[in-house]
Regions:
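N-terminal glycine-/serine-/threonine-rich beta1-alpha1-beta2 phosphate-ribose binding loop
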Residues: 1-95
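Active-site-lining helix/loop region of Rossmann-like oxidoreductase modules
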Residues: 9, 153-280, 311, 318
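Gly/Ser/Thr-rich loops at beta-strand to alpha-helix junctions
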Residues: 12-14, 81, 107-110, 114-115, ...
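Rossmann-fold NAD(P)-binding glycine/threonine-rich loop
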Residues: 87, 104-131
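A short hydrophobic/small-residue beta-strand
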Residues: 99-101
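Alpha-helical support elements that line or immediately flank enzyme active sites
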Residues: 142-153
Length: 349
């Protein structure tokens, strides 16, 4: 079987892991790498991500990459604060027939709830080129897709659903992303993620998509933001030393009201230290260990409590995208949702 030829975009914290996965995957061939940092231009992709030389030289020249006529783009770059640019970046490739697997174009999670100015150009480009688009998600994606839907499919009736996502981000180096959540700031200040359209496009659309799966209409969506500091300094990868009194834990609660009651709730809890905000939802799994924990609570005829901890949880984000590439390349053109394609298997070694 011919290998799928892939161009990767982005070599940040997640991108490096994603590019490494592409290099390792025997079903894929890395043929191009788009980078934003001038110091990375001209370097071998393997050198950038800590792998042996590949012969693929990083570039910032999109036209040169377009000429490669690859099967798929694996988009790992951040779109925070640059949504329009990120859309424009991939449109020519979609128009040329190159498929797109992305962790970052969040409006495509459930396009009918995304911002039209970001969704429409992508859909039109895919239609023109006969290409496919799949957003796999960033945190790491499956908890609001296959995992949740499989759980709900095992129940006869449901009264309420609560999803809690918890991450220890002390060793996460994404400074700008954490600033969007208000870390290392005054806890009284509402951060950009809560006050701008960004948060709505990330999570409100997701809740509406889950409501569609439940075949229910959302009557109202409410959001609440909490931030707490600690009384001791914290050493972090993103900020260096975070002083006492600065935001060290954030909790974002988004609730979808259906049938006259709060039926679906999502909470995202991030901590710069595992002992921050002890009064909030926590986990004994991997305590003090970098990773991502998901808890799912379902009340209904068959009540359910599930907790899943991934020690290298953030690494799942690019891995899910890379595993999906062969399926997306072979799928019908258009926008794909996670439930549209089969569960993608890992490599066995």
């Amino acid at each position: 079987m011919r290998k799928k030829r892939v161009i990767a975009f982005g070599t940040g914290y997640l991108g490096k892991q994603g590019v490494a996965k592409i290099i390792e995957d025997p079903a894929l061939e890395l043929v191009g790498l788009k980078v934003a940092s001038p110091e990375k231009v001209g370097r071998d992709a393997g050198d950038i991500v800590g792998k042996p030389a590949t012969g693929v030289i990083a570039t910032d020249d999109s036209a040169a990459l377009l000429a490669l006529k690859a099967d798929c783009i694996a988009y790992f770059a951040s779109t925070v604060g640059r949504d329009a640019e990120a859309v424009a970046e991939v449109v020519p490739f979609l128009e040329a027939g190159t498929n797109l697997v992305t962790i970052s174009h969040f409006d495509m999670q459930y396009p009918k709830y995304g911002q039209p100015e970001h969704v429409k150009p992508l859909i039109e480009a895919a239609s023109k080129g006969g290409s496919s688009i799949l957003l796999t998600g960033e945190e790491p994606g499956f908890a609001f897709g296959q995992q949740l839907f499989a759980i709900l499919s095992s129940m006869g009736s449901v009264e309420s659903i609560r999803i809690v996502e918890m991450s220890d981000v002390q060793q996460y180096g994404g400074t700008e992303s954490l600033r969007m959540y208000g870390f290392n700031e005054d806890p009284a200040v509402k951060p950009p993620m809560f006050t701008s359209h960004v948060g709505a496009s990330w999570h409100v659309g997701t809740l509406r998509g889950i409501a569609d799966f439940l075949r229910q209409d959302v009557e109202e969506i409410t959001q609440n933001w909490d931030a707490l500091a600690v009384d001791y300094p914290i050493e972090t990868a993103a900020f260096g030393t975070v002083a006492p009194g600065r935001t060290a834990a954030t909790r974002w609660t988004v609730t979808a009201h259906m049938l006259g009651r709060p039926l679906l709730t999502y909470q995202k809890i991030l901590r710069l230290h595992h002992e921050a905000a002890p009064e909030w939802e926590s986990t004994a799994l991997g305590k003090g260990e970098a990773g991502v924990t998901h808890k799912i609570f379902v009340d209904g005829d068959a009540g359910l409590r599930e907790e899943l901890f991934r020690p290298r949880g953030i690494s799942a984000t690019p891995t899910i995208a890379v595993n999906a590439i062969p399926f997306v390349c072979d799928a019908p053109s258009g926008v794909l949702l996670q439930q549209d394609i089969p569960l993608y298997p890992p490599r066995i070694f």
